[in-house]
Design a protein with these regions (language model features):
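Short Ser/Thr-rich beta->loop micro-motif in glycosyltransferases that lines
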Residues: 25-41
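C-terminal alpha-helical cap of glycosyltransferases
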Residues: 92-98, 119-131
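Short hydrophobic beta-strand element within catalytic cores of glycosyltransferases
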Residues: 23-25, 51-54, 58-61, 66
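Amphipathic alpha-helical segment in the mid-to-C-terminal domain
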Residues: 10-13, 86, 103, 115-126
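A short, well-ordered alpha-helix in the C-terminal region of glycosyltransferases
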Residues: 95, 101-116
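Conserved acidic donor-binding loop of glycosyltransferase catalytic domains
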Residues: 25-27, 45, 62-63, 69, ...
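Nucleotide-activated donor-binding/catalytic signature segment of Leloir-type glycosyltransferases, i.e.
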Residues: 1-22, 31-33
Length: 131
C-alpha cells in the first residue's frame, strides 16, 4: 500500500519511518535554487538519506551521484537507473517485496552504515575541516 503523508515535524520522522517497509528517494538529475546560481547537485547534502539509514530500512533511490558516497548498489540500496519512468520504480518495489532475506540484509547494512553518518560523526568531520 502507498501512503502519502502530510508534513511531519522533524522530531517525529524516525517514528514515522519505522512504520514503513521501503523508503523511496526519487531525486531528479539536477537541482536549482532561487537566484539563478545554477545546478547545485554536486553540493547537495542528502539529509533524507541519513534519516533513512538511521532507521535501518530498505532504500530505493534515483541514480543520483551525491548519494553514491554512502549508497552501494544492492548492498544497502536499490538504485533506479531509469528513475524518470514510474514503472521502473514499481518493478524494483515488487522485486524487493518477494525477497525477505535481501530486505533483512540491506536493513541491517543500513543501520550499521547510519553510525558512520550520524549527526555526531558528521559534526566531527566538519570540525576537523574548520580547525
Amino acid at each position: 500500500n502507498l501512503h502519502l503523508q502530510d508534513y511531519i515535524p522533524y522530531k517525529d520522522i524516525p517514528n514515522s519511518l519505522d512504520k514503513m517497509d521501503i523508503l523511496l528517494m526519487p531525486y531528479v538529475s539536477s537541482i536549482t535554487v532561487a537566484g539563478n546560481v545554477g545546478d547545485i547537485t554536486k553540493f547537495t547534502s542528502p539529509l533524507k538519506l541519513f534519516d533513512y539509514l538511521s532507521v535501518g530500512k530498505i532504500i530505493i533511490c534515483s541514480d543520483f551521484q551525491v548519494l553514491k558516497e554512502a549508497i552501494k548498489e544492492k548492498e544497502n540500496a536499490i538504485i533506479v537507473k531509469n528513475y524518470k519512468n514510474i514503472f521502473s520504480w514499481k518493478k524494483e518495489i515488487h522485486k524487493l517485496k518477494n525477497q525477505p532475506q535481501k530486505q533483512f540484509i540491506m536493513s541491517k547494512n543500513n543501520y550499521q552504515l547510519s553510525q558512520k553518518y550520524s549527526l555526531k560523526e558528521r559534526a566531527k568531520k566538519i570540525l576537523k575541516v574548520v580547525k
